[in-house]
Regions:
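P-loop (Walker A) phosphate-binding loop of NTP-binding proteins
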Residues: 8-9
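Post-Walker A helix-loop "phosphate-sensing" segment adjacent to the P-loop in P-loop NTPases
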Residues: 23-32
């Protein structure tokens, strides 16, 4: 089982990159989770409409900070998902399906490092020049480049190019 912490500016193509990996390995072997998944559930319970505009991005960032400060909830929720994925990978290997990878979306440099150390993860930055020029609405989004990533994926081309980069990335990790 491999773990990748993935980051990039909003709309850089992080989910599209993960989808390319899913096309190559199958969705059973590639999972996608974010440190804000549970935060979004709480926000929806509080009336958030699910639209990520600048105001809601700021709200989600602040809510995540509060839940982290209170009891490290976002990290604990991600750890549960990683544990579930680990069990699923063990089951799949017994069936001869092959190993898998879980992508954890995370913005904050300190949390990226913690995830890397806790799960022996590779860190991935997805870059797309056209979206990097926009001003960010919160500290988490504006700190994307405040970390030294293991791998940088340049997403300035088309989908077939990104697909080829996903193929190379998975191959380098020994996942085929």
């Amino acid at each position: 089982m491999r773990v990748a912490v993935i980051n990039g500016a909003p709309m850089a193509g992080k989910d599209t990159f993960v989808q390319c990996c899913q096309l190559l390995l199958g969705s059973v072997r590639v999972w996608n989770v974010s440190t804000v998944d549970f935060v979004k559930e709480v926000a929806k319970y509080c009336g958030w409409n699910g639209i990520k505009d600048p105001a809601s991005r700021r709200f989600l960032s602040q809510l995540k900070d509060s839940l982290t400060e209170w009891d490290d909830i976002p990290f604990k929720k991600v750890a549960q998902v990683v544990s579930n994925f680990q069990r699923e990978c063990s089951r799949l290997e017994q069936l001869g399906v092959g190993d898998g990878i879980i992508f954890i979306h995370c913005r904050e440099p300190k949390e990226i490092q913690r995830l890397k150390e806790t799960f022996n993860a590779v860190t991935v930055l997805v870059r797309r020049e056209v979206v990097e020029k926009y001003e960010q609405s919160n500290g988490a989004d504006s700190g994307v480049f405040d970390y030294e990533y293991d791998v940088t994926i340049d997403n300035n081309g088309d989908i077939p190019e990104l697909h080829a980069k996903a193929c190379s990335f998975l191959s380098e990790l020994g996942l085929e």
